[in-house]
Regions:
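Conserved motor-coupling elements within RecA-like helicase/translocase cores
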Residues: 90-98, 102-128, 136-142
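A short beta-strand-to-loop transition that corresponds to the Sensor-1 phosphate-sensing loop
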Residues: 80-81, 130-133, 149, 184-186
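SF2 helicase catalytic motif II
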Residues: 134-182
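Pre-Walker A segment
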Residues: 1-78
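Helical mechanochemical/support elements of P-loop NTPase systems and associated helical scaffolds
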Residues: 28, 32, 44-47, 56-60, ...
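Short beta-strand-centered segment that lines the nucleotide-binding/catalytic pocket of NTP-utilizing
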Residues: 73-85, 104, 184
Length: 186
């Protein structure tokens, strides 16, 4: 026999971690992070308000890191698919293959793959980055939901049904999982 048959299960989407990618928080960012963690002791939902390019993403990354150390899943919601590309690059540089992306530009097979990773609480879906529809993934160990740009009107689903506001639905989902919600706004 000349050939042997092997079945290798590979993911269609994979992200690589950059070894030397480090985030150094400024004094203001570090204070903000500590304030958020303090407020999470009292409140399950908190608002982080900062102007565009003020460094909110770095604060999100450090907060996400703390929830991952507790072996929790994190959902990072964005208002538009177009914003995922830039954020995926930043998050995957830091978290590597723990990132999964879920939105309608992915084909059905890719979405089913992400769905299964989330369902199995796989290492490949510890941080799920997505738009409104990512709320409906089968999380089993959700610890944090970050709703970036929570003021955006695109979080409202008008057509087709069901009609919902993703920010409000995220808060309800977090309640079911006893998770925390961080709303980011500019």
């Amino acid at each position: 026999q000349i050939f042997e048959e092997y079945y290798i299960n590979t993911d269609r989407v994979s992200f690589e971690k950059e070894d030397d990618y480090q985030i150094q928080l400024s004094e203001v960012q570090a204070t903000t992070l500590e304030n958020i963690k303090e407020k999470f002791q009292q409140f399950d939902v908190n608002l982080l308000h900062g102007v565009t390019a003020s460094g909110k993403t770095e604060v999100y990354i450090k907060l996400i890191e703390e929830f991952l150390q507790q072996d929790k899943q994190v959902l990072f919601l964005l208002p538009e698919i177009a914003l995922t590309t830039q954020l995926v690059q930043r998050l995957s540089a830091y978290f590597g293959n723990q990132i999964a992306v879920f939105h309608s530009k992915y084909n059905s097979n890719e979405r089913v793959e992400v769905y299964n990773h989330v369902l199995q609480n796989s290492e490949k879906a510890k941080v799920v980055l997505g738009v409104r529809s990512a709320l409906f993934l089968p999380f089993s160990n959700l610890g944090l939901i970050v709703v970036d740009e929570e003021h955006e009107a695109t979080y409202k689903q008008q057509d087709p049904a069901p009609r919902y506001h993703a920010r409000d639905a995220a808060i309800v989902l977090a309640k079911f999982h006893n998770a925390k919600v961080l709303l980011g706004s500019a």
